[in-house]
């Protein structure tokens, strides 16, 4: 565990206890840290230490929540992960495991969504990877609400809670704070046929951020 957060550290034996390029990799919705070991092994083979934490209500933190309750808590999970990223980073730094300029954050699906929020929140992230994610938090949240209404589903919260959630999301919505990218390297991948997280929103993000990277070497 790192700061009481269940996590795996995947590394070569000779890196143990030493400063080394490190990536914190975040799993998707209803997944867990062990399900992303293939990403970790590939990154380790490329010379990168990987930290795999379990998100709130996932993996070792599963409290038996069904799909409906987990879906209703989606944004709480994302916001909790953003907060916990700072705790993980601080703990790794205090243990002398990080190298200046060599700290990355990445993830798939919900993990990629969290990565975008982390980029809007933390300057210590040097490089990021987002696969099948969505940086437009308010747009995604509104789409989820519209979906629930269309299906005739009643959310177990009142409107004031929803309003407060949107205020919290605005603070970490990368699409509203693109200047916070500060031209940091960001690898984005998204399949056009994705039916869970719309590809169109990633396409929109690419159009929004491309001008911000003009003049960079890559």
What are these regions (language model features)?
Residues 1-17:
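N-terminal cap/lid segment of alpha/beta-hydrolase-fold proteins
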Residues 18-28:
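Short beta-strand element of the alpha/beta-hydrolase
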Residues 29-41:
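The serine-hydrolase catalytic nucleophile loop
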Residues 39, 198-209:
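Short alpha-helix in the alpha/beta-hydrolase fold that links the catalytic acid
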Residues 42-66:
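Conserved alpha/beta-hydrolase
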Residues 88-147:
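Primarily recognizes the serine-hydrolase "nucleophile elbow" in alpha/beta-hydrolase
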Residues 139-198:
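The feature captures the conserved acid-bearing segment of alpha/beta-hydrolase catalytic domains
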């Amino acid at each position: 565990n790192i700061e009481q957060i269940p996590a795996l550290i995947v590394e070569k034996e000779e890196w143990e206890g030493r400063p080394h390029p490190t990536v914190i990799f975040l799993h998707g919705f209803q997944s867990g840290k062990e399900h992303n070991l293939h990403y970790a092994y590939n990154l380790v083979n490329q010379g990168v230490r990987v930290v795999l934490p379990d998100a709130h209500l996932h993996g070792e933190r599963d409290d038996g929540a069904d799909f409906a309750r987990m879906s209703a808590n989606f944004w709480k999970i994302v916001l909790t992960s953003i907060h916990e990223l700072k705790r993980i980073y601080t703990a790794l730094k205090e243990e002398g495991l990080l190298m200046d300029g060599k700290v990355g954050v990445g993830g798939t699906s919900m993990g990629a969504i969290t990565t975008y929020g982390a980029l809007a929140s933390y300057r210590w992230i040097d490089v990021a990877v987002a696969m099948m994610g969505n940086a437009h938090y308010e747009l995604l949240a509104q789409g989820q609400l519209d979906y629930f209404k269309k299906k005739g589903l009643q959310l177990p919260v009142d409107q004031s809670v929803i309003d407060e959630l949107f205020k919290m999301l605005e603070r970490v919505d990368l699409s509203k704070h693109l200047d916070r990218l500060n031209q940091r390297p960001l690898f984005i991948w998204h399949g056009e046929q994705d039916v869970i997280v719309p590809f169109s929103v990633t396409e929109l993000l690419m159009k929004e951020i491309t001008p911000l990277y003009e003049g960079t070497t890559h």
